[in-house]
Amino acid sequence: LDGIVDCSPQLRRRPLSPLVDALRAIGADIEYLEEEGCPPIYIKGGKLKGGEVAVDAGISSQFISALMLVSRLWASPLSLGLRGEIVSRPYVEMTKRLLEMSDDDSAPYIEGDWSAASFFYAYCLLVPDKDVRIGLLRKPDLSVQGDAAVADIFKYLGVESEWEGDGEVVLHGNRHVIDSRRSMSVPVEFDMGDVPDLVPALAVCMALAGIRFRFIKVSHLRHKESDRLSALQTEMGKIGFAVETGDDFISWDGRRLPMSKEVIIESHEDHRIAMAFSIAAAKLHHITIRGGECVSKSFPGFYGELRKIGFVIRIIY
């Protein structure tokens, strides 16, 4: 099939060249229609030969996963050569596991989404007296998801996970632990190289809880649905936090900024930015998010779930 692949103006800014270069190397006929390295692209259909291909692994694991998934249709098996440090490595492992399961006649088990659960862990950090029950998750030691690390990360911060069978977990905050993390004179540092999707929820809730932080190995967050480092710095400034970012880190050292009475957050058309700042309403009591409907990309029922735990949500047209 011949055709044009295009997307929203926001996603047009995401670099696509590592994937296009890899596909061209195995016979794909792809042409950039506007900016070199970014969508839209024109694809002329044809059979791909497969075989050895090199791909830059330092921008997004999605390029690797895409090649792995479609390689079953190629004439020759795929042999991937990865350049640079692999970011979001657990997603590559998850793709590998899925392909292995597809060789089995039994139906694969589809887990609940740990990255989506991170926003409710964030809520419990901000409202430690209220428990939250989440279903459909697999215990971290059984899960194929790297983002299952959220349970250990939040345990350190003071949110405990109490399992009731393999699939249902009750979250509750431990004020003593939360207060001890808040009183630390140096920032809590986490390496987020394998779990970048957890950064927005963690950054917003830790700042609102008064816990200083420094997240490293986050350079690939500049190439998500938005430049998430820049988006977090800008929007967290609106709620009073002087956040610093660099090539490969984002941090908050406790410094505060003046905050306006009416907070209007731009979602940057990024579902994780919208969800992270929605949770902030638990502490700020009132917040407006422009473009909040973008949460439908990964969590269509998000606002409905927030209503269940007491949020009042109003759509402004």
Name the predicted role of every residue range.
Residues 1-317:
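Short, structured segments at the rim of ligand-binding sites
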